[in-house]
Regions:
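Central regulatory/effector-binding core of bacterial HTH transcription factors
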Residues: 89-151, 220-221
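Hydrophobic hinge/microswitch elements
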Residues: 126-130, 135-139, 145, 199-254
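Short helix-boundary/capping micro-motifs
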Residues: 10-28
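Alpha-helical linker/hinge and terminal dimerization helices associated
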Residues: 42-43, 66-87
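Secondary-structure junction motif
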Residues: 189-211, 275-279, 293, 297-298
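Flexible hinge/capping segments at coil-to-helix
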Residues: 154-191
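A short LG(V/I)-centered, amphipathic sequence patch enriched
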Residues: 40-59
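Beta-alpha-beta core module
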Residues: 152-158, 163, 225-274
């Protein structure tokens, strides 16, 4: 079975037009038609309902089955190509949220040999985006955060820190007179928040749902520095993990919610990934360095 034929077929199931698929791949329309016929001959089934050529392409029942399997085959093919390319060069493409990049990685950098840094290609992105990139093969490794429990069985995860979430306010804010807060009491407050690809937003939604409140988010960003600056300028308050280091002028108020989510951080990679000896050594060194630190001492 030809990978290119499967690529043509999957594209046809999405675009539902032979001419559009041909244009997408810069080939002739007969090339696409021939690829579909080869698949039908090999699989001994009809994949398309051939009715009015002016109507969008429709799939038979087996055509839908083949579409599902073809998507999986192409994903595995992409993973294979990316894994082989990275293993051959002994490089590690690592996804890392800005909070981890700023608040965790610098504290272990001195434990790592200088040569290691030339073998790491860091990608800055939120934890949810990093997890997706890991599963798609765009990343070899991720140092990511998750809430409560991690249940994805396709990912090997080694957790090295767990932190609580708190409310961050300016030191001169009226809320700063409290020693602790319940999230429900903040229902009329304005919040500034990290965007949806961060687990902080998941935590915000979880607490809102548990307390049956919908606080207003007046500003959102991918940059933790922007969030802290907005809080300092009294634009809004923020829900942040205790892993975030606060600059002068800001104060952390613990939450009293019994079922408040926890911010957990770990090193993750795909179970199916086979690393070169050099890559495996890099991962072992990174993981050991993260585990050697008492993160609650900071």
């Amino acid at each position: 079975m030809n990978i290119k034929d499967l690529q043509y077929y999957v594209s046809l199931t999405q675009l539902k037009n032979f001419s559009l698929v041909a244009a997408q791949f810069h080939v002739s329309q007969p090339t696409i038609s021939a690829a579909i016929r080869r698949l039908e001959t090999e699989l001994k089934t009809q994949l398309l309902i051939r009715a009015n050529p002016h109507l969008p392409v429709a799939l038979t029942t087996t055509g839908i089955q083949v579409q599902r399997h073809a998507n999986q085959i192409l994903l595995e093919h992409q993973l294979m190509c990316q894994e082989v390319a990275h293993t051959t060069t002994d490089q590690l493409v690592i996804g890392m949220p800005p909070i981890i990049e700023i608040n965790y990685f610098p504290r272990i950098a001195s434990q790592l040999p200088q040569a290691l840094f030339s073998q790491i290609q860091p990608i800055s992105q939120g934890s949810l985006a990093a997890l997706k990139g890991l599963k798609k093969g765009q990343l070899d490794l991720a140092v990511l955060a998750y809430l409560n429990e991690f249940t994805d069985t396709t990912i090997q995860l080694t957790t090295f820190d767990t932190q609580s979430f708190s409310i961050v306010v300016p030191t001169d804010d009226p809320l700063a007179t409290n020693s602790q807060l319940q999230f429900r009491s903040l229902r009329h407050q304005h919040f500034v928040a990290l965007k949806d690809n961060f687990v902080h937003r998941q935590a915000f939604r979880q607490l809102s749902h548990q307390n049956h409140v919908r606080p207003t988010i007046v500003f959102e960003s991918n940059e933790i520095g922007s969030i802290l600056n907005m809080v300092r300028q009294h634009v809004g308050i923020a829900l942040l993990s205790n892993a975030v280091q606060l600059p002068a002028g800001l104060q952390r108020l613990p939450l009293t919610d019994a079922q408040a989510p926890t911010f957990n951080v770990g090193v993750a990679y795909r179970h199916s990934m086979t690393f070169s000896p050099t890559q495996a050594d890099l991962i072992q060194r990174l993981t050991a360095a993260f585990q050697s630190v008492d993160w609650h001492a900071y």
